[in-house]
Amino acid sequence: MKMLVFPVLAALFAVGLGNLVGAPRDINISEAQDALDFAVAKHNSGTNDMFLRQVAEVVRVQRQVVSGNKYIITVKMAKTPCRKDRVVNEVCEIHKDPALAQPYECTFSVWSRPWIPDLQLVGEKC
């Protein structure tokens, strides 16, 4: 009987833990807004398009604890009518017409170390 109880209890304990320690966990976008803003700015500076892209929809936001925080953010991006070389404090809304907006999905990975005021874009897949 004892030999049967231990494996059953161990299995129940493992199922109850859910996510592994150190695995990415879903979080609210408000916890990763700075990381998302940073990633979008880097994305825009790295494209050859003359128009800015903005976030049309947040699909998923996760945080993984890795010598700081790694934010894994999946968003739908779309084109705005604002030119990159003319934007100062202009509000740039996404084109309403999907043919002009040309939406696409990106996953950004941003590494943050709160004790150092430094963000790094460590992954971008669009």
Curated annotation (Swiss-Prot):
Temperature-dependence annotation: Stable between 20-40 degrees Celsius.
Cellular component aspect of the GO annotation: cytoplasm; extracellular region; extracellular space; vesicle
Protein name per UniProt: Cystatin-C
An example molecular function term from Gene Ontology annotations: cysteine-type endopeptidase inhibitor activity
Cystatin domain boundaries: 22-115
Pfam families listed in its UniProt record: Cystatin
SMART domains recorded: CY
Record family assignment: Belongs to the cystatin family.
pH dependence: Optimum pH is 5-6 and pH 6-8 for papain and bovine cathepsin B, respectively.
Predominant place of localization: secreted
Renumbered ranges of motif Secondary area of contact: 64-68
Biological role stated in the UniProt entry: Thiol protease inhibitor. Has high papain inhibitory activity and inhibits to a lesser extent fish cathepsins L, S, K, F, X and bovine cathepsin B in vitro.
Record has Plastid as a keyword: no
Keywords from the UniProt entry: Disulfide bond, Protease inhibitor, Secreted, Signal, Thiol protease inhibitor
